């Protein structure tokens, strides 16, 4: 494992712990500047790795990238996904009702307003927004191949409830959130018809339950992320545990399932027409 990867995981686990950088540095007996250097990929001693693992309540092997990484906070999970995406050449995913990396600025705007009504921790909100902005910008610059499968059931709920489905918001904001949801689904239909190079969507029509997962293939390895956290949920939510791993047995099993689902899913003109039918049935008028 490269030192930069240890640094990336250190940052993700620091966010997962909820501890401040200066608090962790003080407990380790190092400066905050030294901690940030570790996160940037500078050499870190094994005894420091051991103390960090104990402090962050993770296995030293996990901190070194061997085993399974678990995250119970959306903030830390999406930070880890951001790190892996930055080195991925191909992304395969069973996703939310949208593929966040190709959503519009309006999606971010309405979500930020909804979160601001519920979360008082401004720093948490800013960190969350920075991570998602960085994810989209990285995709825009690198353009990895992306294949996304969307569940029809989740799209129906998305159109009925709008962006931020699980976030409590005013009736006025909920109406706006539904309008943005309809716009996003309309954009996906247009993207399907336009067939841009390296970007594909399909619909899962008859699948009652799927686990959101992302396979990210880089030059050296493939990483799997299993995710209960939707990209339009509050950063303060603690309703699940996500995981990230490069274990071959987990990666291969999920890859086989994704390949079967992709082969059986609705694609192309048929998928675009189905999305427009869902818009006509469920979108706000």
What is each of the regions a protein language model found here?
Residues 10, 20-21, 38, 87, ...:
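Residues at structural and domain junctions
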Residues 30, 49-51, 56-59, 74-78, ...:
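Alpha-helix boundary/interfacial micro-motifs
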Residues 1-77:
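Basic, Lys/Arg-rich alpha-helical nucleic-acid-recognition elements, primarily the DNA-binding modules
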Residues 66-97:
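Short, charged recognition helix plus adjacent turn
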Residues 31, 45-46, 56-59, 70-73, ...:
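Short, surface-exposed, charged/polar-biased interaction segments
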Residues 93-284:
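Hydrophobic protein-protein interaction segments
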Residues 6, 25, 31-33, 88, ...:
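Short, well-ordered helical secondary-structure segments
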Residues 40, 50-51, 61-65, 78-79, ...:
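Alpha-helix boundary/capping detector
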């Amino acid at each position: 494992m490269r030192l930069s990867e240890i640094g990336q995981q250190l940052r993700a686990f620091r966010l997962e712990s909820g501890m401040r950088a200066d608090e962790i540095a003080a407990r380790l007996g190092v400066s905050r500047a030294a901690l940030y250097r570790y996160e940037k990929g500078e050499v870190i001693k094994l005894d420091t790795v051991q103390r960090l693992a104990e402090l962050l309540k993770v296995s030293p092997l996990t901190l070194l990238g061997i085993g399974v990484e678990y995250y119970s906070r959306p903030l830390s999970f999406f930070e880890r996904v951001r790190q892996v995406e930055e080195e991925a050449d191909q992304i395969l995913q069973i996703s939310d009702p949208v593929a966040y990396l190709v959503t519009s600025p309006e999606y971010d705007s309405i979500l930020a307003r909804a979160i601001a009504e519920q979360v008082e921790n401004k720093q948490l909100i800013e960190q969350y927004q920075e991570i998602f902005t960085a994810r989209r910008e990285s995709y825009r610059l690198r353009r990895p191949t992306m294949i996304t499968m969307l569940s029809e059931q989740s799209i129906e709920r998305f159109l009925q409830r709008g962006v931020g489905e699980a976030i409590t918001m005013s009736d006025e904001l909920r109406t706006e959130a539904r309008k943005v949801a309809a716009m996003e689904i309309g954009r996906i239909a247009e993207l399907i018809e336009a067939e841009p190079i390296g970007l594909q969507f399909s619909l899962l029509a008859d699948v009652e339950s799927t686990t959101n997962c992302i396979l990210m293939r880089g030059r050296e390895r493939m990483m799997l992320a299993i995710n209960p956290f939707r990209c339009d949920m509050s950063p303060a939510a603690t309703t699940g545990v996500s995981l990230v791993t490069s274990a071959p047995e987990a990666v291969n099993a999920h890859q086989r399932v994704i390949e079967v689902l992709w082969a059986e899913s609705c694609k192309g003109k048929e998928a675009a027409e189905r999305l427009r039918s869902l818009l006509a049935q469920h979108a706000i008028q």
